[in-house]
Amino acid sequence: MTSSEIAMPGEVKADPAALMASLQLLPSPTPNLEIKYTKIFINNEWQNSESGRVFPVCNPATGEQVCEVQEADKVDIDKAVQAARLAFSLGSVWRRMDASERGRLLDKLADLVERDRATLATMESLNGGKPFLQAFYIDLQGVIKTLRYYAGWADKIHGMTIPVDGDYFTFTRHEPIGVCGQIIPWNFPLLMFTWKIAPALCCGNTVVIKPAEQTPLSALYMGALIKEAGFPPGVVNILPGYGPTAGAAIASHIGIDKIAFTGSTEVGKLIQEAAGRSNLKRVTLELGGKSPNIIFADADLDYAVEQAHQGVFFNQGQCCTAGSRIFVEESIYEEFVKRSVERAKRRIVGSPFDPTTEQGPQIDKKQYNKVLELIQSGVAEGAKLECGGKGLGRKGFFIEPTVFSNVTDDMRIAKEEIFGPVQEILRFKTMDEVIERANNSDFGLVAAVFTNDINKALMVSSAMQAGTVWINCYNALNAQSPFGGFKMSGNGREMGEFGLREYSEVKTVTVKIPQKNS
């Protein structure tokens, strides 16, 4: 599922009048959503934090408080790690469980997510500000597919026999690492929760996971579904809290064997340092990006404009994959800018629960201010502000879709990850030039190229210093393909078969035998 292809029912028409007439075909948000789960989830039980502290959870569309959630700190992390270690101990129910049964539990969890899909999508919109239909058709679709994908892998992770010299029989085993600490971001709360727990549980690990303090509600709801699905106590523990306390405790905990983090490069560095200083726990990092999107003159212009638009503005621009450095070949530059501005001006910004809304609010006041400050830096440094550039409305954290032209590589908006609805359009003359400029970044998460020349496409894709390259598409992510970054965009891979390698150890076993026969 891609950001620009929301799979709505076929009967829903494309033109606005027909769309409004057929809205009854679309799913509806859960009315008067009750927030049931606001406590820490340890050992399949809901608990108050040891400190008794709570923190507010807000609706970014209004700025108003939704509820308060128990705040986990180091003491609570210690309790969760103890529960996870007990669940992982030799002879435990979880360790003795058949791999096929682990797969069945993941499939059952997917069934429960499908049952509660509208409720979870409502929660993602209420707590995270994303349009409900995008949450329902993209985020929740990704959650379900990821759970089912790894459910299918559970009993298919095989070792091998190795023909070594001498009278020996040698084979390998793929074993779970142990207790996995996981820290997830606020931009895709439920999807990132699933990206983390699904491969870990598939391999037989146990989990201590911290959702972002801005968006803990859907992760806590998943705790109830995990218990209902039948996962044993202690296998998954969910602890909402802040990075400097709960997150730091996970990163440095001696009882945690592996950590996976999605978030900023700055915090990723701190986590890798803490992992090294403590017990050299294994680390997977999915960090920031400043991704190049290269548009050649022979591309389908209307299609490239729409894909580039979605590649930046999807999810309010709050994507690590955002194609925010759009390099356009000189001969089509002015026309591309013109059409991009027209498209941005048509983008509908509004309530996440309005079915016509394309863009909701930024996550909070801090992020809102950061985006507006970077927009002002673009103006100050000489980029041409084609449209947008301001906050929108009296309530909430909405920002106008913003387009800059005449952007140069040395500007802050061309170098720093904005994480907001801001499109920067740069021009280039030659392939060699654009390859060098596209790679001239500390980041290397994704890249894209739009062209009708397959030789040009393959040449550029092989030259890009990025973990994923899209040709004539953008944000085409799926459960089957590995995802991760080069350079300061992180290390390790999530998703696909490669994602399993991050959650298992390979053990070699050699047996002395009386006589070997080939």
Curated annotation (Swiss-Prot):
Q: Which residues bind NAD(+)?
A: 184-186, 210-213, 264-266, 366-370, 417
What terms describe the molecular function in GO for this protein? 3-chloroallyl aldehyde dehydrogenase activity; retinal binding; retinal dehydrogenase activity
Give the catalytic activity: retinal + NAD(+) + H2O = retinoate + NADH + 2 H(+); all-trans-retinal + NAD(+) + H2O = all-trans-retinoate + NADH + 2 H(+); all-trans-13,14-dihydroretinal + NAD(+) + H2O = all-trans-13,14-dihydroretinoate + NADH + 2 H(+)
Q: What is its EC number?
A: 1.2.1.36
Q: Which residues carry this modification: Phosphotyrosine?
A: 168
Which Pfam family is an annotated match for this chain, by its short name? Aldedh
- Where is this chain's protein located in or outside the cell? Cytoplasm
Q: Which GO terms describe its cellular component?
A: perinuclear region of cytoplasm
Q: In which pathway does it act?
A: Cofactor metabolism; retinol metabolism
Q: How does it assemble?
A: Homotetramer.
According to its UniProt entry, the function of this protein is described as: Catalyzes the NAD-dependent oxidation of aldehyde substrates, such as all-trans-retinal and all-trans-13,14-dihydroretinal, to their corresponding carboxylic acids, all-trans-retinoate and all-trans-13,14-dihydroretinoate, respectively. Retinoate signaling is critical for the transcriptional control of many genes, for instance it is crucial for initiation of meiosis in both male and female. Recognizes retinal as substrate, both in its free form and when bound to cellular retinol-binding protein. Lacks activity with benzaldehyde, acetaldehyde and octanal.
Q: What is this protein called?
A: Retinal dehydrogenase 2
Species source reads Mus musculus (Mouse)
What gene makes this protein?
Answer: Aldh1a2
